[in-house]
UniProtKB/Swiss-Prot annotation:
Assembly and interaction partners: Homodimer. The RNAP catalytic core consists of 2 alpha, 1 beta, 1 beta' and 1 omega subunit. When a sigma factor is associated with the core the holoenzyme is formed, which can initiate transcription.
Record-linked InterPro entries: DNA-dir_RNA_pol_insert, DNA-dir_RNA_pol_RpoA/D/Rpb3, DNA-dir_RpoA, RBP11-like, RNAP_asu_C, RNApol_insert_sf
Official protein name in the record: DNA-directed RNA polymerase subunit alpha
Domain notes: The N-terminal domain is essential for RNAP assembly and basal transcription, whereas the C-terminal domain is involved in interaction with transcriptional regulators and with upstream promoter elements.
Pfam families: RNA_pol_A_bac (PF01000), RNA_pol_A_CTD (PF03118), RNA_pol_L (PF01193)
Region (Alpha C-terminal domain (alpha-CTD)): 255-343
Top EC class, one word: transferase
Biological classification of the source: Bacteria, Pseudomonadati, Pseudomonadota, Alphaproteobacteria, Hyphomicrobiales
Catalytic reaction annotation: RNA(n) + a ribonucleoside 5'-triphosphate = RNA(n+1) + diphosphate
Keyword list, A-Z: DNA-directed RNA polymerase, Nucleotidyltransferase, Transcription, Transferase
Amino acid sequence: MGETVTIQKNWQELIRPNKLQVTPGSDATRFATVVAEPLERGFGQTLGNALRRILLSSLQGAAVQSVHIDGVLHEFSSIAGVREDVTDIVLNIKDISIKMQGEGPKRMVVKKQGPGAVTAGDIQTVGDIVVLNPDLQLCTLDEGAEIRMEFTVATGKGYVPAERNRPEDAPIGLIPIDSLFSPVRKVSYKVENTREGQILDYDKLTMTIETNGAISPEDAVAYAARILQDQLNVFVNFEEPRKEVAQEIIPDLAFNPAFLKKVDELELSVRSANCLKNDNIVYIGDLVQKSEAEMLRTPNFGRKSLNEIKEVLAQMGLHLGMEVPGWPPENIDELAKRFEDHY
């Protein structure tokens, strides 16, 4: 048992943040600042660097893999009536941000006549594909010019170069495109000192995250943390020790185990706590047996203190004037120690 307790102290006695503080940016679907504090010294840098790398490289997203442009044989061509050459059009296509439900590959098409600009918003999509930056300009058409492009969209992670997006049986005219699947566009972090109580040398981790809108920054951090957790599991070579459960012992008690909690652990005012101490009321089991009249006879104990104690007991489902059979038990100190995690 002693060895188990020592092992558990390795992680149980480290300070941990209670929750993340998330501050949305101008567009909550794309920008946010996430703060975690307090962290043990050094953990800000450790977690910040690991989460940043995962956010940028390992989250699933959707992107264009290839494009077929009618009348174009390769990316070094030009199109009559289109001001941009095909190389520039391909560079613009790489910047299309997409959200797609389900697996790919899937198709989407744009067909337009000039004059005017062709934007990502002109793309005809199926129901489970959404173009997130419809104002992105793909090319410009002169009077009488026409263009038709068919895109192949797939899901993946990280960055995939065009060479890997070219299928072995690629038809003539299919132009593979570099794909940036990650829905996270930018991540930065900083680590500062923070205070916890009187201790000043804890870490505060602040992460600033920008996504393409396919995922919120808060969800992106959650997925990255889950990936890190899953990857680290293989390094844990032991089972989590099981604690004794109170249910196995409670049937042997003739009273509510909450009565074994000491009154000085209750959130009482100094005046009320001192009055209980002076009256030798140590455990809640001692307190609940007292009547209101008995409490008011306690020196320096007034109606305000009485109401405070009644409110605290009510929050625990208890009250003054209760009957507690079998109280106090002979081994009260030992029982209190065994049940301290269960009331």
